[in-house]
């Protein structure tokens, strides 16, 4: 996957960013989960939230003081998840935990590389819907075999 690059952004208080990507595509991303996380508390202030700018070279979004920011790949992944075009990382990690799978065993179960599982597990790349389907299928078969 190529690194995503941001061209412009528009903020919408309290938590939405409309992102125009260098590719010409547009995404609306709700960053509520960031705003409610430690280190991002300043984003709750409307004036601070609307001070967002595109980082140099389009690698992310940063706010007025330069100490708060979100990288482009995370925004891209989050936008895909919110649009229903990617399997949410929280659901993928819950599947791994529920089935007591390590990174290597999850990779083996899904027929993908361990490195890919690391990217998915850490939220570094959007997780394709077919991986969600594979997780559901694997879990269904595992339950049937256990019965």
Positions of PLM-derived features:
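Motif-centric detector for short Cys/His coordination patterns
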Residues: 1-147
